[in-house]
Amino acid sequence: MNNLEERGHLLTEQINPNSQNLDQLSSLELVELFNAEDAQTLKAIAGAKLELAKAIEVISEALRQGGRLFYVGAGTSGRLGVLDAAECPPTFCTPPEMVQGIIAGGAQALIRSSEDLEDKLEDGASIIAQREITPLDVVVGITAGGTTPFVHGALMAAKTRRATTIAISCVPVEQVSIEADIDIRLLTGPEILAGSTRLKAGTVTKMALNILSTGAMVQLGKVYGNRMIDVAVTNRKLHDRALRIIQDLTDLNRTEAGSLLERSGRQVKLALLMHSLGVDAETGAHLLATHHGNLRAALNSALLKD
């Protein structure tokens, strides 16, 4: 990491020429300006597509081998990591330990700013030791400006433990170097409010995390077509979604879909396999396990045998 005391040259700290009269704009002009500037996030994702694709492959393979995915950040970056990690269990029925978000300052920092805690390199290293990171794991360090000591400490400690490391930042490599196996640069330019990286930098970071986690889960077979077939049926909304998925992918009515869902132990993926192959829950579960939980692979295997 570059030893930076002066950060004014960083892309995320620079003055945006398009918003220099920000305090004089009408409400409509403010909305139009935000809309125009946010278009940069799409270009930034496109510019990093190769690195994002490589990261998906690395993460999915690590999770397939029993490893874990950790997001590490401070402030907005940390909160976004925690948010994405928290959404994985209900969306993909993953165990809570599979994808974890780590924020400088811990849970309290989610609701109250703790920016001073991001300056401690040793705290980042310590959290990696506490989570007992192994070579099977992937650690994603998120730092918009690329300089957060907490994140650099975590990445360095993870590398020492031979874990795969991924860095996500919003500054060019010429301004800040980051030691990581995969270096994702999301260049959205100066913020409308100078230095406020909760804006474009935060938006593009969330987009990238959406891509990484969803992409990895797709490759793990937790999606069939574009349906979340591993959805955790934990409330009325998700129960309704589970029924609609079964109905849409079979010829069953809602009552029949409900009966099938219950017989499968409320596992949509298993219910679909049971219906397609005419097998019971135990047989279906065994077949899914044989194919590492991949419904399409299990179905194709059964069809090849017929």
UniProtKB/Swiss-Prot annotation:
Reactions it catalyzes: N-acetyl-D-muramate 6-phosphate + H2O = N-acetyl-D-glucosamine 6-phosphate + (R)-lactate
Enzyme Commission number, as recorded: 4.2.1.126
Gene Ontology annotations of biological process type: amino sugar catabolic process; N-acetylmuramic acid catabolic process; peptidoglycan turnover
PROSITE patterns xrefs: GCKR, SIS
Pathway assigned to this chain's UniProt record: Amino-sugar metabolism; N-acetylmuramate degradation
Family classification: Belongs to the GCKR-like family. MurNAc-6-P etherase subfamily.
Function: Specifically catalyzes the cleavage of the D-lactyl ether substituent of MurNAc 6-phosphate, producing GlcNAc 6-phosphate and D-lactate.
Protein name (Swiss-Prot/TrEMBL): N-acetylmuramic acid 6-phosphate etherase
